[in-house]
């Protein structure tokens, strides 16, 4: 069973981050709108909700500060 737990959109750029449950794992997905209307997705799976929430929270902090590049944000999921 898969479902979205939370999704947050950056008010400045339209970028989004979602926290999803996929079976017994949790996934953080970073979504970047491209100029041609398509989207670039980067995601990472986590074994625990605590680990996934930690990364999800970091994205929200990055969105709030507005100081970090797309590359910096993608690096959170490496």
Spell out what each predicted region is.
Residues 1-31, 69-70:
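Short N-terminal "domain-start" leader segments
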Residues 3, 38-40:
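Tryptophan-centered short beta-strand motifs
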Residues 7, 21-24, 36, 51, ...:
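Generic detector of low-complexity/intrinsically disordered segments
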Residues 10-11, 30-34, 45, 75:
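Secondary-structure transition/turn motif
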Residues 16, 43-45:
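Well-ordered beta-strand positions in beta-sheet-rich domains
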Residues 34-38, 45-67:
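A short, charged, amphipathic alpha-helix used as a generic interaction element across diverse proteins
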Residues 62-78:
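Short glycine-rich, low-complexity/disordered patches
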């Amino acid at each position: 069973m898969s479902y979205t737990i939370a999704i947050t959109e950056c008010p400045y750029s339209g970028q989004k981050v979602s926290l999803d449950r996929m079976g017994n794992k949790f996934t953080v997905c970073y979504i970047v709108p491209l100029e041609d209307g398509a989207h670039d997705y980067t995601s990472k799976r986590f074994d625990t909700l605590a680990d996934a929430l930690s990364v999800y929270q970091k994205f929200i902090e990055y969105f709030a500060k507005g100081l970090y590049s797309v590359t910096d944000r993608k690096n959170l999921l490496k």
